[in-house]
A protein has these predicted regions:
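An alpha-beta-alpha
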Residues: 219-278
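Periplasmic-binding protein-like
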Residues: 173-185, 202-205, 244-248, 297-317, ...
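Alpha-helical protein-protein interaction scaffolds
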Residues: 1-102
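Extracellular/periplasmic periplasmic-binding protein-like sensory domains
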Residues: 307-308, 324-397
């Protein structure tokens, strides 16, 4: 298995699976089970087009199992696909001992979700955030009812009146709750993350820093780090390799820059300059320092540094509104700017948008698609859902859609849910990660950009 681990670390999932499959006839008991789980994790991470194996060896069997499960839509379809595959391959190691995630899928299919607890604060600093999340969550619930889907019942619990988490879980169990959505408060999510286990599967609506928590805890939020990684992916897909960066002074800016830098450098990109935005009066000088204007001997116009191919920007709309005109003024108007969604106020303020023409930014599908039928329904009732609060409505809708699918996302690591807050997948540490869509300010309007190949 040492060789298999080395191949896996090198990103060669198929070769690692082949190596482990060759070992399986000689293994029994726990060793066989953990080898099966490792093979499943490797083949399940491959895209469907790589799973069309020819032949009847052990590895081909694993690949046909992964393809069968991935091709099925609902939990019940997946169950049928697994049962059918086992009937066709009765002597295969995976038929004799199903990998643990598939055993869990079987359990999930036999326990339909009938009751969800929504644990959110009704008072305090987060009350307005909480209300947007709750309204989005319930909008998705009513939509499921209208579609005749017989959705689970929802029971509300107020986290701003919690005496203790233990007491809450005792009450929820007594009420017959099978899944908790919430809490939102970071300190409560941290407490849950530090526990060895939870009595009920829980989808927290925030992230705790640090290590992986108990097996029953999943975490979902609008992390700025997801957006920083998204910028790195997009710029790389657009063929760029050398970045400058501007982020706000402080802990938030540091976190976002770190996430961008890690994703960017992991794939061979370099960061050639960084400025931390502080006071508006210093901005012009900071932009000048970053683009390093130089006087040219014969030419009357100075030129910017040429080793910087684009600028990664994490900033408020007000800051972005100053930065783009300043770049133009500093003879760096041709420097592409890739930004997080924080530059987009979604206020409809044409003057503000005009100052940002040319900035590309990642954003939730919710705010980029005004014609989405659910968005039209929701904004008719809550007009503020069309503005920057819309991201939270979208997250509430996605929390509802994620609720019954957590086990599937965990069992099938590369599966995705196309949500309103982004395209959602599950990390190995059970955090929901978002990939976003792209737009560019053009003629004072955000215009959708086509997706890239990757």
């Amino acid at each position: 298995t040492v060789h298999a681990r080395a191949l896996e670390a090198d990103g060669q999932a198929l070769a690692a699976a082949r190596e482990r499959a060759a070992l399986s006839p000689n293994l029994t008991g726990d060793a066989a089970n953990s080898n099966n789980d490792a093979i499943w994790a490797l083949v399940a991470s491959l895209p469907a087009e790589q799973l069309h194996a020819q032949g009847n060896d052990v590895l081909s069997g694993w690949m046909s199992l992964a393809l069968a499960v991935k091709s099925a839509g609902t939990l019940q379809d997946q169950q049928n696909a697994i049962d059918q595959w086992r009937a066709q391959n009765p002597a295969h190691p995976a038929a004799i001992q199903l990998p643990t995630p598939l055993v869990k899928l079987k359990e999930l299919a036999s326990q339909p979700l009938t009751k969800i607890a929504l644990l959110l604060p009704q008072d305090g600093q987060l009350a307005s955030v909480s209300k947007a999340l709750r309204d989005g969550f319930m909008a998705a619930h009513y939509q499921a009812q209208q579609a005749g889907q017989n959705p689970p019942s929802i029971q509300f619990y107020d986290s701003s009146r919690l005496t203790s988490l233990d007491e809450f879980y005792r009450q929820a169990q007594a009420d017959g709750v099978q899944l908790v959505v919430g809490p939102l408060e970071k300190n409560l999510v941290k407490q849950l993350n530090s526990r060895p286990q939870l009595p009920i599967t829980t989808l927290a609506l925030n992230y705790s820093e640090g290590t992986q928590g108990p097996a029953q805890l999943f975490q979902f939020g609008l992390a700025a780090e997801d957006e920083a990684r998204e910028v790195a992916r997009r710029a790389r897909a657009d063929g760029l390799t050398r970045a400058g960066a501007m982020v706000p002074v402080g802990e938030w800016g540091d976190r976002v820059l770190k996430a961008f830098r890690q994703e960017w450098e992991a794939h061979g990109g370099t960061v050639v300059g960084v400025e931390h935005i502080d006071k508006p009066v210093a901005l012009a000088q900071q932009v000048a320092d970053l683009v390093q204007l130089r006087k040219n001997g014969g030419s009357s116009e100075p030129t910017r540094r040429q080793d910087m191919q684009f600028l990664f920007l994490a900033a408020t709309p007000q800051q972005a509104q100053q930065i783009k005109p300043t770049l133009n003024y500093q003879y760096a108007g041709d420097l592409p700017v890739y930004a997080t969604s924080h530059v987009f106020s979604a206020s409809g303020d044409q003057n503000q948008y005009n100052d940002m023409n040319g900035i590309r930014f990642c954003e939730t599908p919710w705010l980029l698609d005004p014609n989405n039928p659910l968005r039209q329904q929701v904004t008719a009732q809550w007009p503020q859902a069309g503005g920057s609060l819309g991201r939270l409505y979208a997250m509430g809708i996605d929390a509802y859609r994620l609720a019954p699918s957590l086990g599937q996302l965990k069992a099938l690591p590369d599966s995705r849910i196309d949500g309103m807050s982004g395209s959602l997948s599950m990390s190995p540490t059970q955090r929901v990660e978002r990939q976003l869509q792209w737009a560019e300010f053009a003629n004072g309007q955000p215009q959708r950009l086509p997706a890239t190949a990757n």
